[in-house]
């Protein structure tokens, strides 16, 4: 007499695929969260760097204007 199978092979394969799919969804969610977090952090960093570069360029331009004014006035 052969023992009866409680779960068929098809059901076990289906369960394993469902667990694998669930793990993939969880991993994709975690990766997506950290990607969005890094993008927002990068945006604020880029904005800060852009403001600093703009300020430095304005200061350099004003410095050059003052040098030209002094040169024209003979100082």
UniProtKB/Swiss-Prot annotation:
Localization per record: Secreted; Cell surface; Fimbrium
NCBIfam families attached to this UniProt entry: classIII_w_PIP
Keyword Transcription: no
Protein's UniProt keywords contain Nucleotide-binding: no
Superkingdom assignment: Archaea
Post-translational modification: The N-terminus is cleaved by the prepilin peptidase EppA, which recognizes the class III signal sequence.
Signal peptide range in chain numbering: none
Residue ranges of the propeptide: 1-11
Main location class: secreted
Motif (QXSXEXXXL): 12-20
The protein's name in its UniProt record: Probable pilin MJ1469
Keywords, alphabetical: Fimbrium, Secreted
Gene Ontology cellular-component terms listed: cell surface; extracellular region; membrane
Entry comment, domain topic: Contains an amino terminal motif QXSXEXXXL, which is part of a class III signal sequence.
